[in-house]
Amino acid sequence: MDQAEFGHLVEKKSASSELFKGRLLHAFRDEVILPSGKVATREYVVHPGAVMVVPLLEDAHGHLQVVLERQFRYPVGRVMIEFPAGKLDPGEDCFACAQRELREETGFSASQWAHAGVLHPLISYSTEFIDIWFARGLRAGQRKLDDGEFLDVFTATPAELLDWCRAGVVTDGKTLTAALWLQNVISGAWALDWHEGV
C-alpha cells in the first residue's frame, strides 16, 4: 500500500517522553497533531521486532506435519500452543534470527527457507513486527534454550492445527496468522519462494 496517498490520515509527533525503559520494552507517551489540527496523546511500546518460523516436516508415511511448541506465557497465565518464535538481537537480521530461534528452541536446522511476510500484531500500542518464515528439509539436532526458557516441542498435522484454531485451543495471534498462511500454501492459493538455507 502506497502510504503517500494517505497523507490526510497521518498524525505528526510534536513531543515525546519516555515512561519506562526495561531490558526488552520501552514505553513512550507522545503528543501528536491530528489531521484536523487538534492535539492528542499516544502511549505505545517500542519493541525490537521478532521472527516466527513455520517448520514443515514429513512423517514416516510422507504426510505433512508442523513443528509446534507449548510454552507458559506469564502475562496471560496460560500454556499456549505456538510456532517457534523469538525477538531480534541487536544488529541481527531477520533470516539469521529465524535460523537461530529454530535451532535453539527445537533443535532443528533447515535446508530450505521461504519468507512469507510481516505481521504487526499490536498496531494500536506497539511498534512490534514479526517476520514470518517457513522452513523445510529439517535436520534434528540439540536444543539450546535460553536461561529461564521452558517449552515442549511437538508435531501436529495441519488439520489438527486448524481444528485447534477453530476450537479456540490456539489463541496466539501470530500462530493464527501462520495457520492462515499454512492453509493457503497447502491449497496452492499462495506460493512461497524457497531458497537454500545455510
Residues covered by each model-derived region:
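Short helix-capping/linker segments at secondary-structure and domain boundaries
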Residues: 182-195
